[in-house]
């Protein structure tokens, strides 16, 4: 009905069993940080980081681009090794894109398209800046959609941290 729209779909650890697999055209797939908290979801004999990597990467074949942001170089290398035969373009944090904090209110993003000095979004934790940088890396790869650097600069100033990490300012929950 709305062919110009982009849908952002999240699937969890067991993506290969997820209903989102009905989507046949992926513009990009993002492999977010693999954490040991996923181990408890696996059968006892399969509770390894390698099994988590398999579950998160086994259905990436129909993606044009794969973006990966991991917490350690070892996990990042393991993911790269796992998807080496995948024909998708691979964009890896700290290899193909990165960010740095140099001033209180700014962070610097850099990828193959160049560097951006960006207003630091209203987010309390550094891992959230990692997520923002991964989103920027993704949108800059989608060159057919003509998202400009100005769009990115404006967009990140509008980010709000709601739900799990929301700072409650008033109300009954704040009073607890």
Question: Model segments located where?
Answer:
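A short acidic, often aromatic-flanked loop/helix-cap motif at beta-alpha or helix-coil junctions
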Residues: 97-102, 173-174
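A conserved beta-strand/loop element that lines the FAD pocket in flavoprotein oxidoreductases
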Residues: 89-95
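Flexible active-site lid/hinge loop adjacent to a nucleotide/diphosphate
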Residues: 2-74
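Short, aromatic/basic amphipathic alpha-helical patches
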Residues: 74-85
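Feature captures the FAD/FMN-dependent oxidoreductase FAD-binding
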Residues: 1-4, 99-101
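Nucleotide phosphate-binding/pyrophosphate-handling subdomain across enzymes
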Residues: 5-6, 18-30, 35-39, 51, ...
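Conserved AMP-binding/adenylate-forming
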Residues: 83, 88-89, 133, 140
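Acidic-glycine-rich active-site phosphate/pyrophosphate-binding loop
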Residues: 101-116
């Amino acid at each position: 009905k709305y062919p110009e729209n982009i849908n952002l779909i999240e699937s969890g650890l067991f993506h290969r069993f997820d209903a989102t697999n009905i989507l046949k055209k992926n513009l990009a797939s993002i492999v977010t940080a693999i954490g040991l908290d996923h181990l408890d979801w696996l059968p006892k004999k399969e509770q390894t980081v390698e099994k988590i990597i398999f579950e998160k990467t086994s259905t990436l074949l129909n993606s044009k681009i794969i973006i990966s942001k991991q917490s350690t170089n070892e996990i990042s290398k393991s993911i790269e090794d796992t998807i080496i035969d995948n024909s998708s373009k691979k964009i890896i944090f700290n290899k193909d894109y990165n960010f740095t904090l140099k001033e209180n209110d700014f962070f610097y993003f850099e990828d193959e398209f160049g560097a951006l000095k960006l207003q630091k979004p209203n987010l309390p934790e550094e891992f959230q800046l990692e997520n923002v940088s991964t989103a920027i890396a993704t949108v800059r790869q989608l060159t057919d959609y003509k998202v400009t650097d100005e769009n990115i600069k404006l967009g990140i100033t509008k980010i709000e941290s709601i739900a799990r990490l929301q700072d409650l300012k008033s109300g009954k929950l704040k009073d607890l």
